[in-house]
């Protein structure tokens, strides 16, 4: 089956999103006393990994990972693992990052907004992994979204992240 022009265009680089993986909150223990957590973020074939924090169920990563957005409808998945030396890494939960509200606000092309201006508020639902309200705001000329994701497929744990759209001179934009 031949691809339409629209489908071919979707594979062009739309832009870049920086995901600041801030911290883990009350992550599950997978070793005797603690865990050695790290985060993996995937979108299509892209796979990004944070560094490992040793012996900590409340790790501070503060690590920036950058995804190239080719298809805005492609799901972004976040997985947390416990690093093990001699056996396979243990799963510590996962979440899906709903990029749609963030990308929709960016499409509006808002410029020169006052610092801290609330642009959109997203409430937790059964369809997203939000632990609490997530607010998209202007931040010194940038649009950012802070969110705390409730991990699924695990007994406890949350991960705090921040999304930021990065300017891409060669991208087609949204």
From Swiss-Prot:
Residues at which Ca(2+) 1 binds: 30-31, 82, 84, 90
Q: Which UniProt key words apply to this protein? A: Abscisic acid signaling pathway, Calcium, Cell membrane, Developmental protein, GTPase activation, Lipid-binding, Membrane, Metal-binding, Nucleus
Q: Which GO terms describe its cellular component?
A: nucleus; plasma membrane
Q: Where in or outside the cell?
A: Cell membrane; Nucleus
Q: What is its main location?
A: membrane
**Name of the protein described by the UniProt record:** Protein C2-DOMAIN ABA-RELATED 6
- Family (UniProt): Belongs to the plant CAR protein family.
Q: Which organism is it from?
A: Arabidopsis thaliana
Domain C2 residues, every copy = 1-115
What are the leading ranks of the lineage?
Eukaryota, Viridiplantae, Streptophyta, Embryophyta, Tracheophyta
């Amino acid at each position: 089956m031949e691809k339409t022009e629209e489908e071919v265009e979707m594979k062009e680089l739309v832009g870049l999103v920086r995901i600041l993986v801030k911290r883990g909150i009350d992550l599950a223990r997978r070793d005797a006393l603690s865990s050695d957590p790290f985060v993996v973020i995937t979108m299509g074939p892209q796979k990004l990994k944070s560094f490992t924090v040793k012996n900590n169920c409340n790790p501070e990563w503060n690590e920036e990972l950058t995804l190239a957005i080719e298809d805005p409808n492609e799901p972004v998945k976040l997985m947390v693992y416990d690093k093990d030396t001699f056996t396979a890494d243990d799963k510590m939960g996962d979440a899906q990052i709903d990029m749609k509200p963030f990308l929709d606000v960016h499409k509006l092309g808002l410029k020169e907004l006052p610092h801290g201006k609330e642009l959109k508020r997203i409430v937790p639902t059964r369809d997203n992994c939000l632990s609490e309200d997530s607010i998209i705001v202007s931040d010194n000329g940038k649009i950012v979204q802070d969110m705390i994701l409730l991990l699924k497929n695990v007994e406890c744990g949350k991960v705090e992240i921040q999304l930021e759209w990065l300017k891409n001179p060669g991208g087609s934009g949204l």
